[in-house]
Amino acid sequence: VRATYKINKKFSVKLSVAQFVYNGKVQKPKVTVKVGSKTLSSRYYTVTYRNNKNTGYATVLVQGKGSYAKYAAKTSFAIVPKQMKKTSVKSTVKKKMTVSWVRDPQATQYIIQYSQNKNFTGKTTKTVTISKNTIKARTFTGLTSNKNYYVRIRSVKVVNDKKLYSSWSKTTRVKVK
């Protein structure tokens, strides 16, 4: 048995939300289906969600029913990593600071920013990417003694060379020894 479906420009799908923050639960945005300018009742189509629990891109498949049975549409939405909450910044050795965090199993890498400017602008701002999600700490050297540094971190999920970012953690201030 072989079915042929038209992916028709007149058959459009709009999602109520384009992006969710990972929370460990299945995500199902509300779907609105239109044919031309007419909004269809849900009795004229079925919705199937795929990969809609973990971080990454989820797929939404809409299949018409009844007189719309030959029509189908596909769209997607993102599930981004949650904000990093348990971070620690310490300076116990001169001109060094260590940033540590709780590993996010949904992430593939981390980005750390540190700066002498609390707005993370200017020449003292540095951005470092940690490419392995198994790493849980990083020590930075060559810093200026007796200066305050501001640090924030976020997790990243890489899917098909596209990056999904969590929001930045709360900024932590540390005085470097």
Where in the sequence are the language-model features?
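Short, solvent-exposed loop/turn segments at the edges of extracellular beta-sandwich modules
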Residues: 65-69, 157-164
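Predominantly extracellular/luminal cell-surface or secreted proteins
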Residues: 34, 113-117, 154-156
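Surface-exposed, short loops/turns at beta-strand junctions within beta-sandwich domains
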Residues: 51-56, 140-148
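Pro/Thr/Ser/Gly-rich low-complexity, intrinsically disordered linker/stalk tracts
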Residues: 81-106, 163-177
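Solvent-exposed, low-complexity, repeat-rich "mucin-like" stalks and linkers
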Residues: 4-38
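Recognizes extended acidic, P/S/T-rich segments that occur
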Residues: 111-144
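Serine/threonine-rich, repeat-prone extracellular segments and beta-strand-based repeat modules
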Residues: 38-70
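Beta-strand-rich modules
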Residues: 142-160
